Amino acid sequence: ALAAKLMLSILPPQTSFFKLQVRDDKLGEEIPPEARSELDLSFSKMERMVMDYIAASNDRVVIHQALKHLIVGGNALLFMGKDGIKNYPLNRYVVNRDGNGNVLEIVTKELISRDVLGFDLPVPTPNTGIDETQGGATDDVEVYTYVKLDNGRWVWHQEVLDKIIPETRSSAPKSASPWLVLTFNEVDGEQYGRGRVEEFLGDLKSLE
C-alpha cells in the first residue's frame, strides 16, 4: 500500500509530474506574448510525448519494484538506459561512498546467456567427468559492471571471466549519471541506507 501511494505521488497516471518552461532571466530580452504562447504550447506537447513514452514503457513497473525494495531493504539501484529503466536489488550490487555519502564506485552482477553476449568465451572445465555444459546453468555467465567517478565524470565498463566486454565502455557527466543509487533513510557514515520496515523492527519482533 505504501509503495502504491509513493508511486502515485512520483508518477501520477493522468498528470504530468514535471513542467517545462523558459526562465525569463535566460532570455536576455522580453519576448512578445504570441511567441511565449507558442513556446508554452510546444513545451506542453513535449510533456505529453514524455508521458506517452512512460505509459508505453515498462518504467512504471520497474520503479514500483524499486520502491518496494526501498521500503523493506532501504536500498535500490536504477540504471536509466536507452531501452528503459533497470532495477538492481541489493543482492545484485555493491556501492562505495565517501565520508559525506557521495557515491564513488558501483559494482553490479548479472547472469547473462553466452549467446546474448555475442563473443567467444572459454568454456569452464567441470570438476567431474560429466559434461555439465549442455543445457545447464553454465550457459549463463556472471557479468560485472564497474562504475567509477573519475575526474568529474562517471565511467563504466562490463567484464566477464576477467575480460572486458568489447564496446561496453561508456561515460557520463557527474551531474547526469544514468546510475541512481537510492536509499530510503540515509545514515551518516554508512555505505547503505535503512528501510521503513526497520523502524518497526522492535514491534515486529514483539508480535512473534
Where are these regions (language model features)?
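Extended, helix-rich architectural segments
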Residues: A1-Q134
